[in-house]
């Protein structure tokens, strides 16, 4: 048994060396730097930060490089590193209404206070391969407009002021922290949003799509999608007042959903909310759609689709947990298989005897 274990260790070390060689690729080619990944593969970095739970572009780019571009493996690496970090402070709530905008669009109103800003996007492109990139084509220069920034209140706040939507209420209870306390179903809204933010983008996208195909009552409009930089502040105990410690690039999505007519309230629109690091717009939209679907019990709506089942959605959203459980099937299961094999052969013998 000892010889078998030592042999396994040698095989594992050799496998890791081979993987490292494969990750590096052809040595005649220049190595891809972490800075290049962070700057030129920014959307992949945004996803790893969002689902890995650390807003650090350098660490996310490093994880992507180490994982050979495997997003889920990079997210796993970032989550593992996160467990080693001390918690030095808790930030004040960020104010996305004061975001320094990179992009802002609304599908419900053409003219909104502060205007719409198309910003960087793949929308409206023809999805044709750009072969000039094979020749290291340079990006076109962009002229920056110098204009005075106008206030950009949330579109949903305009609806609430007109009595068309219900204002979100802060009940004063501290938000849950799913990194310290395991979720318990049914979840609080804060716990649900945290799990959705860390959830797998593809999984949430599929569930969001299902709500549009009839598996759950959900008729949404993109009330507002905004991306930009927000200030992060903390209140040090020794000072007693807030101090700006930096800024974060975030994407926020508020979906205007079908109206409800409660008995004790006037009819009003409902909302779904999504928030991600970076420019992860598709993830923010999917998150907002699923968030609204999970509010079905709050509005006494019939559970008509998987996206409305809170425990089903949230318990299977984490790609690190999912990948870990599926991957464990690669480990030796010799004893378990031999037991089933013996049982199958016994049943076959009994069947032959009639």
Question: Where are the model-predicted features located?
Answer:
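Short, amphipathic alpha-helical interaction segments embedded in low-complexity terminal/linker regions
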Residues: 1-227, 241-243, 349-354
């Amino acid at each position: 048994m000892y010889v078998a274990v030592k042999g396994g260790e040698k095989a594992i070390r050799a496998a890791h060396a081979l993987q490292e060689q494969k990750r590096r690729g052809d040595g005649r080619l220049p190595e891809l730097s972490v800075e290049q990944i962070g700057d030129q593969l920014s959307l992949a970095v945004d996803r790893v930060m969002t689902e890995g739970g650390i807003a650090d572009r350098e660490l996310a780019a490093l994880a992507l490089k180490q994982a050979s571009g495997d997003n889920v493996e990079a997210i796993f690496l970032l989550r593992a590193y996160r467990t080693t970090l001390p918690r030095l402070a808790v930030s004040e709530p960020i104010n996305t209404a004061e975001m320094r905008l990179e992009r802002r669009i609304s599908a419900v109103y053409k003219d909104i206070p502060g205007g719409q800003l198309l910003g960087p996007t793949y929308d409206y492109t023809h999805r044709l391969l750009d072969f000039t990139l094979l020749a290291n084509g340079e990006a076109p220069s962009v002229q920056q407009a110098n204009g005075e920034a106008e206030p950009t209140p949330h579109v949903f706040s305009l609806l609430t002021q007109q009595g068309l939507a219900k204002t979100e209420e802060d009940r004063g209870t501290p938000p849950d922290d799913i990194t310290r306390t395991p979720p318990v179903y049914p979840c609080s809204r804060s716990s649900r949003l945290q799990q959705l933010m860390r959830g797998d983008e593809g999984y949430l996208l599929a569930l969001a799509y299902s709500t549009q195909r009839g598996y759950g009552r959900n008729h949404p409009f993109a009330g507002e999608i905004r991306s930009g930089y927000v200030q992060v502040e903390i209140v040090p105990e020794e000072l007693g007042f807030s101090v700006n410690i930096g800024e974060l690039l975030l994407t926020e999505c508020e979906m205007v959903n079908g109206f409800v007519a409660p008995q004790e309230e006037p009819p009003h629109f409902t909302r779904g909310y999504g928030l991600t690091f970076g420019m992860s717009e598709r993830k923010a939209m999917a998150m907002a759609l699923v968030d609204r679907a999970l509010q079905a019990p709050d509005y006494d709506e019939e559970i008509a689709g998987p996206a409305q089942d809170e425990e089903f959605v949230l318990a299977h959203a984490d790609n690190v947990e999912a990948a870990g459980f599926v991957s464990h099937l690669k480990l030796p299961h010799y004893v378990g298989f031999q037991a089933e094999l013996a049982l199958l052969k016994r049943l076959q013998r009994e069947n032959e005897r009639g």
